[in-house]
A protein has these predicted regions:
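Short, conserved SAM-binding/catalytic segment
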Residues: 45-50
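Acidic donor-binding/catalytic loop of UDP-sugar-dependent glycosyltransferases
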Residues: 39, 61, 79-96
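A conserved acidic beta->alpha catalytic loop
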Residues: 33-42
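Catalytic metal- and UDP-sugar-binding loop of GT-A-like glycosyltransferases, i.e.
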Residues: 32, 55, 79-81
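Cell-envelope/extracellular polymer assembly enzymes that use nucleotide-activated donors
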Residues: 2-4
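Short, well-formed alpha-helical segments that are part of the catalytic scaffolds
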Residues: 6-25
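Glycine-rich, basic loop-to-helix element that forms the pyrophosphate-binding segment
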Residues: 56-71
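Short aromatic/hydrophobic "clamp" motif used to bind/position activated sugar donors
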Residues: 76
C-alpha cells in the first residue's frame, strides 16, 4: 500500500516518540510542526522514515491542507501526535488494497 502518515505537532515531546515508533513500518511519515519550543522536532528528526517541516499555525484546516498538498501517495493517514496506533490497527490499514 502506498500510504503516508501525517502528524500535526506543537510541543508534543511527551507523545511524539511513541506515535512515531508505532508508525515505523511506514516508508513515509510527514510531521508538520507549528514551531514547537520543546524537543518535538529533534525527537521526530531521529526517525529515519520521518520528514519534518515547520509551518506557522493559522488554522487547523490550513495545516492539514498544506500537509496533504505535499503528499504523493495514494493514501493518507491523518493523526494527531498523541494518538496511540496499535500494531494490529496499522497492519489492518496496510492490508487495504
Amino acid at each position: 500500500m502506498n500510504l503516508t502518515a501525517i502528524l500535526l505537532t506543537f510541543n508534543e515531546e511527551h507523545n511524539i516518540a511513541r506515535t512515531l515508533s508505532a508508525l515505523s513500518k511506514l516508508e513515509c511519515v510527514l510531521v508538520i510542526d507549528s514551531f514547537s519550543s520543546d524537543k518535538t522536532v529533534q525527537i521526530a528528526e531521529g526517525f529515519p522514515n520521518v520528514t519534518v517541516l515547520q509551518r506557522a499555525f493559522d488554522e487547523h484546516t490550513k495545516q492539514w491542507e498544506f500537509a496533504r498538498s505535499l503528499v504523493e501517495s495514494d493514501w493518507t493517514l491523518a493523526l494527531d501526535a498523541d494518538y496511540q496506533v496499535s500494531e494490529n490497527a496499522l497492519n489492518e490499514i496496510l492490508e487495504i488494497e
